[in-house]
Amino acid sequence: GAKITIDSASMMNKGFEVIEAKWLFGVRPDQIEVVVHPQSIIHSMVQFEDSSIKAQLGLPDMRLPIQYAFSYPDRLHASFPRLDFKTCTQLTFEQPDTKRFRNLALAYEALHQGGNMPCIINAANEVVVSAFLNDRISFLGMSDVIEKCMQQVSFIEKPTYEDYVATDKLTRIMANEL
């Protein structure tokens, strides 16, 4: 939908994936690296201690990665087109431009700080994306509001469930006012 389109364009979606990877796989933030892959053929890669790499490849379509995630460890028959390596002549990778796409850098900052900071960035992002879709904020202005919320909402190192609920509410109020 519209929100995921904006999150992808601003690279906040990648930022959320970095935060998710830390929790899903129990890795340190410095073990998670984002690379831009313009062909969108490689959906994920893991490099192991011995330097070998396992990658999940497919057409630029999220049906296969989602099917794989839901059916693992089983493999289901795919009813959609398959990747043909004969037509896949080039795979390129680039470093993300975190100066231009500040949301990815903000997500890494939230991950490094921990505590309730990922909650703050999530709540602020939901508000600014809605504001952008309703023509109340510019595309680049979204990052400014998220960053201000990260600076102004009280940081809690070891939040309780109640702290998360309060943080979410306060951040949404603040983001709407900025």
Predicted regions and their residues:
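Catalytic, metal-anchored helix/loop core of enzyme active sites in primary metabolism
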Residues: 1-178
